Amino acid sequence: YTNSQITAVSNSIDQRKYILERCTKNNIKNVKVITADMNDFEIQDKFDNVISIEMFEHMRNYKKLLSKISNFLNEKGSLFIHIFSHEFLTYPFENEGDGDWMAREFFSGGMMPSHNLLLYFQDDLKIDQVWRLSGTHYEKTSLAWLNEMDKNKRYIIEIFKETYGEKNARIWFQRWRIFYLSCEQLFGYNNGTEWGVSHYRFVKN
């Protein structure tokens, strides 16, 4: 899509660096990358489409967020959202004890939304289409990541030494292994019918 103008927004400095490196490598010149906290992010540009990939799970005020995104869109613009979700439960990842390791180490302040949660926030944008994808897809993805991690253990340990320090490198290797194992079991549970992936297309009211 060489005639498109693409603006990417992430709160990760490393992610911005990686995207720009890939763009340079592939001679892609129509991508701009902004590092920002979405809670504070504002932009004057208007867009035909906004795509959100696994951001809403890290936000809490969906009413305010969807209102903000509606201001980014042209009158005929649309918003596509990709999130993990539970079939009917919404619950936060909060560090309230020793057992809350996933909240503490990976998803502090995050939330597992229910599949229908976003349907309650249609003040500024309205639902056009909804899709529910089986959790078995992410089950397979988690297992593939685990296998790649195990195959590249020696290389990853060296990276973790730089990131977490010599003493904590192997601890973090095991934490990531447990994370992938947990995700594999979670999303594969009950043939992928409880935890899965939800897609939504919103348009302006």
What do these predicted regions represent?
Residues 19-20:
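Conserved SAM-binding loop
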Residues 52-55:
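A short beta-strand submotif of the Rossmann-like class I SAM-dependent methyltransferase core
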Residues 63-78:
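A short glycine-rich, Lys/Arg-flanked "PGG" loop and its adjoining helix->strand segment in the class I
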Residues 39-50:
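A short acidic, Gly/Pro-enriched loop at the edge of an enzyme's catalytic core
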Residues 1-3:
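Conserved SAM-binding loop of SAM-dependent methyltransferases across substrates and taxa
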Residues 25-40:
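Conserved SAM-binding strand-loop segment of SAM-dependent methyltransferases
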Residues 85, 89-197, 203-205:
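Substrate-binding/catalytic lobe of Class I Rossmann-like enzymes that use SAM or dcSAM, i.e.
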Residues 5-11:
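Conserved SAM-binding motif I beta-strand of class I
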